[in-house]
Curated annotation (Swiss-Prot):
Miscellaneous comment text of the record: There are 4 isozymes of pyruvate kinase in mammals: L, R, M1 and M2. L type is major isozyme in the liver, R is found in red cells, M1 is the main form in muscle, heart and brain, and M2 is found in early fetal tissues.
Keyword terms, alphabetized: Allosteric enzyme, ATP-binding, Disease variant, Glycolysis, Hereditary hemolytic anemia, Kinase, Magnesium, Manganese, Metal-binding, Nucleotide-binding, Phosphoprotein, Potassium, Pyruvate, Transferase
Activity regulation information from UniProt: Allosterically activated by fructose 1,6-bisphosphate.
Effect the entry attributes to changing residue 130 to Y: In CNSHA2; Conakry
UniProt-recorded name of the protein: Pyruvate kinase PKLR
Name of the gene this protein is made from: PKLR
């Protein structure tokens, strides 16, 4: 039977009557034709021969290459293996529960890629010690260059946020605000460290002017809500609408109020200078409302911090409405769902999440999904079913990174939380509808005369067509790796670089596995290229996603330096 005759006979049959193995006939293996422009049918025997032992490519393969989205959903198989190597990066917040060197080593082994320091809490001395601990933990893996794991350090600014003061029992104490009781919200400095169940201090002096009678004050991600009854000389007299346990330094939201805080406070500027001095890789800029807020952060970093990536956190209605202008000047976006879910209706947060992730994917910029992803694991060893679905759906939406906050900063199970996110992400990545995703990204890509971008598109398409197990890219700044990530290859992108900062920062990009190559350059350029490519291959074998007989796509430059990536070749692993 000819291939064309085989196509006709297959089209007459319903997919329901086929085994999943037979449905794998409809996969991407290189010849043009079909609705996507590059699809043809192949026999099961040919499929097996083409794929060989390329385990990395076979997870949820029938679903990934289905003809329609509905068919893709129907073909998802709970018995299919997860992907061999997780593509989505995990950001873990470092706090009292996780800042020891030994605990950090465990978290790195569990899958932490980026360590986040929340500058809403802690002194500069505290964070300097945390940074030193992270670097000590990372360097403990430096014995073998093949198993070394670069970990980026991110500084999360306080931003123009409002917080409560410290309770009179100390920073670790808690009080319960009972529903129906009266609470005075004050800006009197005398209560800054003497808060209690009757009086709550906040660090925003103008709160008495911007919140009217009947207005609401939300505390601790909206868990506690107060309704203003009277505006008095000492502050706002409120009634507890929704009670709860209040700790120190909790976030305060004033939805609908015209908060007149500057985009960057003096404390933020000091924190950013501290970050530059201590060599942080990423800044998470809080409460970004417009493009000029990002420019202010860039100016505060100064020329010494020009290489630091700025990820803008979208946390309010204005930020969502001005998203495009913020995205244009940012290195990436964080969907910060905590404050966002208070500033806009909670039932609309998922719309904002999907919109922002989609626009970031189209623009080729990293996007982080954050807040309450595994919140129950602060106190419990296992997440709720809804939380596991939330993490998986963030991955399916297209997030480059998923973040843990209190789960690792103060939770009882920080290592277990990282392991759980790792496991969920592996399963979700296998279930991505790769055929549709790549075709849409390629179709939406603007025309370009940039050799690096053109090479990246060609490399990803070639990887799909030959079912390559990996794309190995030699990169100086990480840009080539980010361009490859933009088109969401099903294969791993192994980025080999001599730049330690680039190796850490590419963790922001989905599917990129950075390798820091420490050997000095060879006198002959071609020899140096071959050594770095071989280093990438050996690392891929060691990590379990390259096997003998697999095909890999190699992307390199034609000369040393940045901006010369324009060569692609196909190698077979021997």
């Amino acid at each position: 039977m000819s291939i064309q005759e085989n196509i006709s006979s297959l089209q007459l049959r319903s997919w329901v009557s086929k085994s999943q193995r037979d449905l794998a006939k409809s996969i991407l293996i290189g010849a043009p034709g079909g609705p996507a422009g590059y699809l043809r049918r192949a026999s099961v025997a040919q499929l097996t021969q083409e794929l060989g032992t390329a385990f990395f490519q076979q997870q949820q393969l029938p679903a990934a290459m289905a003809d329609t989205f509905l068919e893709h959903l129907c073909l998802l198989d709970i018995d299919s293996e997860p992907v061999a190597a997780r593509s989505t990066s995990i950001i873990a917040t470092i706090g009292p529960a996780s800042r020891s060197v030994e605990r950090l080593k465990e978290m790195i082994k569990a899958g932490m890629n980026i360590a986040r320091l929340n500058f809403s809490h802690g002194s500069h001395e505290y964070h300097a010690e945390s940074i030193a601990n992270v670097r000590e933990a990372v360097e403990s893996f430096a014995g073998s260059p093949l198993s070394y794991r670069p970990v980026a350090i991110a500084l999360d600014t306080k931003g123009p946020e409002i917080r409560t003061g410290i309770l009179q029992g100390g920073p670790e104490s808690e009080v319960e605000l009972v529903k129906g009781s009266q609470v005075l919200v004050t800006v009197d400095p005398a209560f800054r460290t003497r808060g209690n169940a009757n009086t709550v201090w906040v660090d925003y002096p103008n709160i008495v002017r911007v919140v009217p009678v009947g207005g609401r004050i939300y505390i601790d991600d909206g868990l506690i809500s107060l309704v203003v009854q009277k505006i008095g000389p000492e502050g706002l007299v409120t009634q507890v609408e929704n009670g709860g346990v209040l700790g120190s330094r909790k976030g305060v939201n004033l939805p609908g109020a015209q908060v007149d805080l500057p985009g960057l406070s003096e404390q933020d500027v000091r924190d950013l200078r501290f970050g530059v001095e201590h060599g942080v890789d990423i800044v998470f800029a809080s409460f970004v409302r417009k493009a000029s807020d990002v420019a202010a952060v860039r100016a505060a970093l100064g020329p010494e911090g020009h290489g630091i990536k700025i990820i803008s956190k979208i946390e309010n209605h204005e930020g969502v409405k001005r998203f495009d202008e913020i995205l244009e000047v940012s290195d990436g976006i964080m969907v910060a769902r905590g404050d966002l879910g208070i500033e806009i209706p909670a039932e609309k947060v998922f719309l904002a999440q999907k919109m922002m992730i989609g626009r970031c994917n189209l623009a080729g910029k990293p996007v982080v999904c954050a807040t309450q992803m595994l919140e129950s694991m602060i106190t419990k060893p296992r997440p709720t079913r809804a939380e596991t679905s939330d993490v998986a759906n963030a991955v399916l939406d297209g997030a480059d990174c998923i973040m843990l906050s209190g789960e690792t900063a103060k939770g009882n199970f920080p290592v277990e939380a990282v392991k759980m996110q790792h496991a969920i992400a592996r399963e979700a990545e296998a279930a991505v509808y790769h055929r549709q995703l790549f075709e849409e990204l390629r179709r939406a890509a603007p025309l370009s005369r940039d050799p690096t971008e053109v090479t990246a598109i060609g490399a990803v398409e070639a990887a799909f067509k030959c079912c390559a197990a990996a794309i190995i890219v030699l990169t100086t700044t990480g840009r080539s790796a980010q361009l490859l990530s933009r088109y969401r290859p099903r294969a791993a992108v192994i980025a080999v670089t001599r730049s330690a900062q680039a190796a850490r920062q590419v963790h922001l990009c989905r599917g990129v596995f950075p390798l820091l190559y420490r050997e000095p350059p060879e006198a002959i350029w071609a020899d140096d290229v071959d050594r770095r490519v071989q280093f990438g291959i050996e690392s891929g074998k060691l990590r379990g996603f390259l096997r003998v007989g697999d095909l890999v796509i190699v992307v390199t430059g034609w000369r040393p330096g940045s901006g010369y990536t324009n060569i692609m070749r196909v190698l077979s692993i021997s």
